[in-house]
Amino acid sequence: MTIPCSRPLFIEPFDLYLFGMGRHRHLYRILGAHPAVQDGEAGYRFAVWAPNARSVHLSGDCNGWRHEGCPLFPVGVSGVWAAFVPGVRRGSLYKFVVRGADGRQEQKADPFALWAEMRPGVASVAWDIDNHAWGDGAWMAERARQGLPLERPVSIYEVHLGSWRRRHGDGHPFLTYDELGDQLIPYATGMGFTHLELLPVAEHPLDQSWGYQTGHYYAPTSRFGSPEGFKRFVDRCHQAGLGVILDWVPAHFPRDAWSLGRFDGTALYEHLDPRLGEHPDWGTYIFNYGRNEVRNFLTANALYWLREFHIDGLRMDAVASMLYLDYSREAGQWLPNRHGGRENLDAVDFLREVNTVIHAEFPGAMTLAEESTAWPGVSRPVYTGGLGFSFKWNMGWMHDTLGYLAEDPIHRAYHHGSLTFSMLYAFSENFVLPLSHDEVVHGKGALLSKMPGDMWQQQANLRLLYAYQWAHPGKKLLFMGGEFGQWNEWDESRELDWCLYRFPAHEGIARLVGDLNRLLRSEPAMHRRDHDWSGFRWVDFADYGSSVISFLRLAEGERPLLWIFNFTPVVRRFYRVPCPRGGTWRELCNTDSAYYGGSDVGNAGAVMAREDHWGGGHFIELTLPPLAAMCFAPVTGQGT
């Protein structure tokens, strides 16, 4: 084997200056491995940031995995080591051999690798960026023109690509990106969802982490194919009218010796003090957000997914753990900030910066925060003191609603406040209502199995939950399997229980979710004013004795929608509900319809509003089905 001779590599001083300032928005094109030609020879240029290393060498296919003989050279005092290596080909495996400041030699993956080998291997793969001809120009232009979808329907189907469907019998369990495109895209669009949210696709060594312990931040996982395969998948989603959101993990990273931790023999990407640099729950390192180069690594990574893969949004995981220095720590296990407080000021600055940059460079791209505390202004603009996210997950709504529905209906009257409390803060943020993967793992059971009663009541409760979620102000998110009433808790090692579609009750649940999505899209009152009081009005929230609530969804210049919910298995006849106008009100949705697997109690498709001669206004008198929700709209041209 001919061992290539590495050569010094010139990097523009301005690129290094921007990196040192934490401001290089295309940093992934400077660091990492990229095809190049030098003196007529084709190869790859390599660059890595390791300011405290004693030496850095390239080891890989190109030199028989020798640890010496192919050195990288320091680029001034920037802390960057770089070299051009002739003869390296696309697809070659490589690692950096870093002799750290502590004298120890470690084989490290490239932090900016564009692809990585399939687990259990952790080597980086020499690849390129510009490898796909995009066909989604119309989608991208329209996204930029319309801006954030605050007043448009958003219904997100959360998916773990490795367990949505699986292959059987050929030894490789995962579908490819192209196979996922063939199956997942038509399924999601057929169900009426507007977006997919993918659990992290950045390469990760452990399946059981679901991608939340990221090993290669710039490399789409090889489980499903190549980086251009993932680009084809996103392209096909856009051409089918489906947005793509990625889960992104800037909160922490794994401690594996080959990864970012102690990269040059020092705490480079993390804090040295474990009270700042180690997460006690997950056994991971926490990024040092106060270091310019680390902030740049993360900010450029966010821009990389948006720019190079045309991603429509990033959902940032575990934001609460970033915001608080004492998160999950006892007294004496954390260090206060410079003002003596518990807020992680560096993390706050980072979140504001990354949100500002994303919204400036990619109008219409969303950022979503999984944030479970009462931190104010998470989804408010940075210039008003907020963190700058587009949306925040409403964890309080999720917790209270699931807790309420887990109660036996006979006890729900005593927990009525759990159902109505969310409206006290529903417009304090731009909320997404999440029924996510976190609610169907670790012994929590599937959504269907959380519901009380016999099988029929469980299914009716689930249909009622979905109608309440879709009717409630806020954007919608549902984890895969929930749409057809998966019985079993989610297991990342096996596919969903698709066999349940053979049962009419489960098919009925899926029909309901599809119809709720179509109602969300077609009725402006269901989505246009999701984030302020003008889109919602209580009709009756106080009938706790019957466990019945009713409210209006509103949009200026559009017909109102009247939603009524009966959270008991009791059929309530001659039930009066006030309404804002007279005439005929047509039924748009009844979750007790036999079409959805219900008992088919209803009102023959419409009710007539009558004048209330005593209290003024109008009312309808109707039959409320058991454990069901109903939606009515006035027939246009009638009433006053």
UniProtKB/Swiss-Prot annotation:
InterPro entries xref list: A-amylase/branching_C, Branching_enzy, GlgB, GlgB_N_E_set_prok, Glyco_hydro_13_cat_dom, Glyco_hydro_13_N, Glyco_hydro_b, Glycoside_hydrolase_SF
EC number: 2.4.1.18
Substrates-to-products reaction catalysed: Transfers a segment of a (1->4)-alpha-D-glucan chain to a primary hydroxy group in a similar glucan chain
GO cellular component, one term: cytosol
Positions annotated as active site in the UniProt record: D317 (nucleophile), E370 (proton donor)
Gene Ontology molecular functions: 1,4-alpha-glucan branching enzyme activity; cation binding; hydrolase activity, hydrolyzing O-glycosyl compounds
Biological or metabolic pathway of the protein: Glycan biosynthesis; glycogen biosynthesis
Enzyme class name: transferase
GO BP term, pick one: glycogen biosynthetic process
Keywords: Carbohydrate metabolism, Glycogen biosynthesis, Glycogen metabolism, Glycosyltransferase, Transferase
A family per Pfam: CBM_48
Disulphide-bonded residues: none
Superkingdom of the organism of origin: Bacteria
Subunit text: Monomer.
Similarity field: Belongs to the glycosyl hydrolase 13 family. GlgB subfamily.
Role noted for this protein: Catalyzes the formation of the alpha-1,6-glucosidic linkages in glycogen by scission of a 1,4-alpha-linked oligosaccharide from growing alpha-1,4-glucan chains and the subsequent attachment of the oligosaccharide to the alpha-1,6 position.
Name of the featured protein: 1,4-alpha-glucan branching enzyme GlgB
Lineage, top ranks: Bacteria, Pseudomonadati, Thermodesulfobacteriota, Desulfovibrionia, Desulfovibrionales
